[in-house]
Every structure is written in structure tokens, then in C-alpha cells.
Amino acid sequence: MSLKYTCPSCGTPLGYEGLCWKCKCEQERQAALAWMPEQIVEKQRNLIQNIQRLADMEDPEFADFWQLLGYHDAITPEIQRAALAAEVFWPCEIYYHAPADVRDGLIHALLSAEYSSAASNLMSCLAMQGDDKAMETLLELERNPRPWRKGLYVDPSSYAQIGGWTFDKEGQKIQLNFDTCYPMVKGTTSEKSPVRIGRAREDTCPHCGGRMVDMLGLDGRDERLKFLGINGILTATCCPSCVGFLKGPAFNHFTLDGGVEIFPSELFDGAEKADCYVSPEDYKALTENPFVLGEAPVPLFYGCASEDVNTIGGFANWVQDAEYTTCPHCGKPMKYLAQIQWDTVFDCAEGTLYVEFCPDCHIVSMQHQQT
């Protein structure tokens, strides 16, 4: 059955009149990126005056917050102080690198908390603030748990990961993300780019028989990618159909000359075989997608403001909880590298692929999340 309408921007068949969701996201992003300085100030002022509406996920405050943070890095200490005064502790990103007085207010609230739900939100906020005193507080709570710890699933060191860092048993801080972010933008398949999403391979998946794909190929020698510390090529390879059905992430070892060794994997239900849900048309769309690395860096939360953006570095737009994989070789937490929104590379796909890597062991992990 053919659909009655098409998107006037990209031609995607639709069951309704108007823009498809991806073109609508792009339109909203371009409008937000074009805000004049006085518009940014007005939105900041409105957010301060109506900060409770942010916690209630009310627009325009909710949308304005994510666009101010993701596209302009414009969450000010005044906004953070207003949030603290109103006891708005969600979304936790509002407290990213907040000043010392706000940090101290968060610590006071956390150490006064009686219930696990409040402690959970406050530890997330403190993780986003992320300075040495924030770490000392979470470390102390890990070593000397409060009664509310029994109501939580994970330790404070896991909450720290929300802010892109954690600490080990000795109290040493470990950085889990990069303080630089680049977007993947639409170019052409023939355009030269140090990063490519979805490169076709000849080998097949042992579970479903579908084609394996280099989901991310990245040349760290490009000047824009020097911040990654990869002096060569990183390749992340998996089965696009089965990666969401594995017991844990997909792993591979990479060599700086572009080589890949794919690690064995198991399906989550213990089955030997699975159906392949990626059609030949989907493989074609995935391996011929036009994404190339953007020319200029963007704010660290650029990939968190919408669901149609693929990024290298910065922060991930976690569908569920922040999840940093443990390296299967050295046991250290891996560093977050990239996110690929499945629906940007072939139609009707759901969820996001998160790519992480161990710089020491040259091992990549790929994990899937969806609602």
C-alpha cells in the first residue's frame, strides 16, 4: 500500500502531510543554531523564571534547555543557581561544571537526603558537576554507604559515569569521555572523510547469516581527531541485525593499519541462530549513507538535543542509563567514542548504537539501546 503524502524536503513517503520527523528535527536545529545573542539571553531569562517547568518537562522551557545546552553551551551559573534554589534536580545535565557554591549546595542536599530516589538524582547532578570535591563526596559515600544505598542498584562510582568519569577502588579519577565533540553531517558517499559509518564487508554473522558491517571506520591521524589519541585507524565491526540481541556488547580488536579481529559473541537467549532483520535494501542504505565528519567542533552535548544526530566524542544521548563497558582484556572501563542513531542510516530502525574503546588494548565495544 503506497502512502498518500511525501515529505516536501526529502521525499520520504508519509501517512500525513508535512515534514518527516528527521527533516523536522533538522529544521528545529537550524532555527536554534541561528538564535541571535539577544534571543539566547531571553531564553536564559525565561528558564530562570520558570525553572520548575523544566523539571515538569514543559515546553518551551524543556526544549529551550536542551537547545541552549546542546547547540550553544549556554547554561549559565545563574540558571544553575536558580535550579538549586528551586530544588530542580532533573535533568542532571543542568549542573554540568556548575560553580563551587552550587556544588556545595548539591553536596549538602545529598548528605541530607533520606530516600534513595532523592539521593539517586543528586548523585547524578554531582556527577555532572564533576570537580575534585564532587568526586571526594561520591568516593566517601561508596566507602561509607548511607542507609538509602540499599534502595539503589549501583554504587556511587556508577553514578559518576553519568558525568563522563568514574573512580577506582584507590580513589583515582578515570575520565570516560572526551572534552571535544564533532558531528557527522550529510555529505556524499564519494566525499573524502576520516570517519565513515557503515562500510560493507564480505564476512557474515555466525548467528543470522547476514553481512557484517564496519559500523565505524575512523582515522585518528586527521587533525580534527587528534584529541582521540589514536595514531591510525580504528574500526568497529558488528552485525547490524544481531548487535541488539547479544548477551552484552559486541567486541573487536583493531590494529592501526585497519585490521579487525571480531570476538565471539552469544545471543541473549542462548540460541544458536537468529533471523536477520536487516533487508538487502537496508544494507544498501546503511553502506551508502552520506555521513561525513563535520569541519568544526560543536558543544559537548550536541548529540543529546535530538534523536537524529550522530557524533564523535562529547556526551552520548543515552536511551536508557549511561553504560560504560568494561574492557574484556584489562578490566578497565572503556572510553565513550561515538553514537550512531540507527534511523539516520536506514529507515524504520530503532534505537542507538554506542561505540566505546580501550586505548590501551585497542579493543572496541558496540552496544545497542532502545526504548
PLM region spans:
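Preference for intrinsically disordered or flexible, low-complexity segments
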Residues: 2-371
